[in-house]
């Protein structure tokens, strides 16, 4: 009976949708979705920091962080559900798929912009100048000196955004006087005297910064956002694959067969009855030896006979009277038989 229960349990546990396989798939899906959620938060944080670092450079790729984060959040909820698990995981896979596409696009845009449009050589050479924000009095002086009349209404609205004139020596020994707004890092080496054609293809001014060191931070943030988007791209593909394999699994408990086998032997009325071995062992009388000790003491009763191979006379069919048991001889000794669980009577001489 115990062997049959063990075999039935092992056959049930070998099913692909058993409880052990379900828990293992659930644990793996939760691990990958939590990891994707952490990466999504990093993408969102770094992307927002890169986007808000300057006013004229807004290419930080934080959109994949929002989409991947929402998809991974749905995946965590769906992995812990039983009834609506499939619907939640399908929605999670859809959002993660869109997030993977957005991460691919933002990784290309941020990487190309950081490599092609930001030149750090003038910054490292200290050839870029930071222009602080001008006060209202200085702005009025600049505007009045430039217009030589009372400032108009449009000019008065832009007092706090008044620009300063910065002299930048050009390659042809000429001087350019660009007008630069306050809180701006300006690089003369990247400015082409007002022409739209840039020398090295990089930005020559970065508006609304606290110092020129913010440009170096912006460069590092863009490359960090690019790397995180690439990580989110591959991790999103892996997460979608894991959730796709888990959405169709249901927990199934192993069914135990508790039927008890009949231990009593079946008796057939048309066949010879079989006697159990233990019955014959306990109830059959013990086998006696052919001769007892008393027989060997009175060996004269049985005369010796020559071997059968040395006798030339034919043996008679009927035994001789000398070989019969004498009536005056005592009976053969047979010890009394007691069952194994019965106590023998006390000894009496």
From Swiss-Prot:
GO biological process: response to bacterium
Composition bias, Low complexity: 316-329
Coiled coil: none
UniProtKB keywords: Membrane, Transmembrane, Transmembrane helix
Entry membrane topology: Multi-pass membrane protein
Region (Disordered): 303-329
GO CC terms, sorted: membrane
Record-linked InterPro entries: TMEM255 (IPR028014)
Gene from which the chain derives: TMEM255A
Principal location listed in the UniProt entry: membrane
Protein name: Transmembrane protein 255A
Entry's family note: Belongs to the TMEM255 family.
Localization annotation: Membrane
Pfam family, one: FAM70
Keyword Lyase appears in the UniProt entry: no
Segments traversing the membrane: 30-50, 57-77, 89-109, 226-246
């Amino acid at each position: 009976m115990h062997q049959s229960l063990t075999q039935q349990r092992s056959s049930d546990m070998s099913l692909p949708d058993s409880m052990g396989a379900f828990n293992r798939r659930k644990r793996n899906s939760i691990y990958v979705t939590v990891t994707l959620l952490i990466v999504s938060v990093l993408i969102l944080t770094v992307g927002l920091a890169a986007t808000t670092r300057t006013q004229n450079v807004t290419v930080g790729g934080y959109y994949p962080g929002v989409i991947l984060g929402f998809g991974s959040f749905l995946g965590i909820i769906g992995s812990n559900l039983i009834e609506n698990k499939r619907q939640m995981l399908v929605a999670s896979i859809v959002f993660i798929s869109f997030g993977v596409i957005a991460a691919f696009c933002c990784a290309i845009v941020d990487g190309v912009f950081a490599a092609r449009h930001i030149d750090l050589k003038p910054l490292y050479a200290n050839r870029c100048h930071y222009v602080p924000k001008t006060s209202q009095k200085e702005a009025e002086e600049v505007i009045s000196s430039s217009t030589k009349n009372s400032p108009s209404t449009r000019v008065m609205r832009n007092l706090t955004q008044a620009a300063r004139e910065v002299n930048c020596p050009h390659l042809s020994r000429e001087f350019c006087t660009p007008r630069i707004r306050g809180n701006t890092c300006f690089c003369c080496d990247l400015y082409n005297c007002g022409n739209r054609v840039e020398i090295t293809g990089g930005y020559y001014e970065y508006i609304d910064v606290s110092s020129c060191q913010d440009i170096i931070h912006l460069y590092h943030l863009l490359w960090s956002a690019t790397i995180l988007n690439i990580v989110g791209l591959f991790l999103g593909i892996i997460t979608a694959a894991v959730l796709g394999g888990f959405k169709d699994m249901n927990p199934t408990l192993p069914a135990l067969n508790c039927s008890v086998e009949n231990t009593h032997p079946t008796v057939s009325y048309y066949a010879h009855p079989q006697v159990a071995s233990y019955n014959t062992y306990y109830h059959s009388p013990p086998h006696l030896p052919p001769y007892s000790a008393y027989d060997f003491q009175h060996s004269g009763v049985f005369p010796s006979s020559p071997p059968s191979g040395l006798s030339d006379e034919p043996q008679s069919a009927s035994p001789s009277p000398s070989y019969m048991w004498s009536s005056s001889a005592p009976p053969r000794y047979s010890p009394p038989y007691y069952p194994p669980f019965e106590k023998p009577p006390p000894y009496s001489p």
